[in-house]
Design a protein with these regions (language model features):
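Short hydrophobic helices that act as membrane-entry/anchoring signals
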Residues: 5, 9-27, 78, 82, ...
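Helix-to-loop junction immediately C-terminal to a conserved catalytic motif
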Residues: 11-12, 17-49
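Structural motif corresponding to alpha-helix initiation and N-cap regions
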Residues: 31, 78, 100-103
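Residues at the C-termini of beta-strands that transition into short coil/loop
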Residues: 35, 74, 94, 152, ...
Length: 216
């Protein structure tokens, strides 16, 4: 019997349902490579993070296939917003220290067959080259059966041509080297993934519009 596709939680469905028309009204949005994102089973999703719009764009792009349970900074958990984020299955992370509780929740979610989304850089790049953090690698070691998928988001940093809508593209793909080696440092895997991601979605200074990189 085929595995059942995980259902979207009511809060997630509502937020994505409201965000989709806003995203598509604000931008000319294109989604490619969605077939790389499995409809069932544990998934670790890595993506670039250049704009506050990125998690919204990725969530909207993936919604036909999966709900993404993202690790997000705990400071977002304010009254009302925190309740919504909890309903969406998002996981708060205390930045600046190893948050074992967040890692445990993410591992549990993966073992339940959910899709965990992580920005390897752990914060918005703001046009700077940041190193990959080790969290993604630790999750991949803990749940080696998880499928590793990458996503690139381009166009979200630029609204300088307003009222002309920016061209936003979300591209999902399977990385060339997703091998989980228990003998290498935990940051080695996310470093490789980030290199592949940034080859397709170079760092962008806010307000600048890069030329899109064609999918490999």
């Amino acid at each position: 019997m085929a595995a059942m596709r995980p259902a979207l939680t009511p809060a997630y469905r509502a937020v994505i349902g409201a965000s989709d028309p806003i995203m598509r009204q604000w931008s000319r949005m294109e989604v490619t490579g969605l077939e790389a994102l499995p409809a069932t089973g544990p998934v670790l999703l890595a993506a670039n993070h250049d704009s506050y719009w990125d998690p919204i764009a990725i969530g909207v792009a993936a919604a036909p296939t999966r709900q993404i349970h993202a690790l997000a900074k705990s400071s977002l958990w304010k009254p009302v917003i925190g309740w919504v984020l909890d309903g969406m299955g998002q996981i708060p992370v205390e930045r600046g220290r190893g948050d074992a509780s967040a890692m445990d929740r993410a591992i549990e979610a993966l073992r339940e067959g959910k899709c965990i989304g992580i920005f390897p850089e752990a914060t918005r790049s703001k046009g700077l080259e940041l190193r990959a953090r080790s969290g993604f690698g630790r999750l991949a070691r803990a749940v080696p059966e998880a499928t590793i998928v990458c996503a690139t988001v381009t166009g979200t940093v630029d609204d300088a041509r307003f009222p002309k809508r920016p061209y936003v593209r979300v591209d999902f793909f399977r990385p060339a080297d997703a091998h989980v080696d228990p003998d290498e440092p935990p940051a080695a895997l996310p470093t490789r993934l980030l290199a592949e991601i940034r080859a397709r979605a170079p760092h962008v200074v806010p307000g600048r519009r890069p030329k899109p990189v064609a999918p490999a």
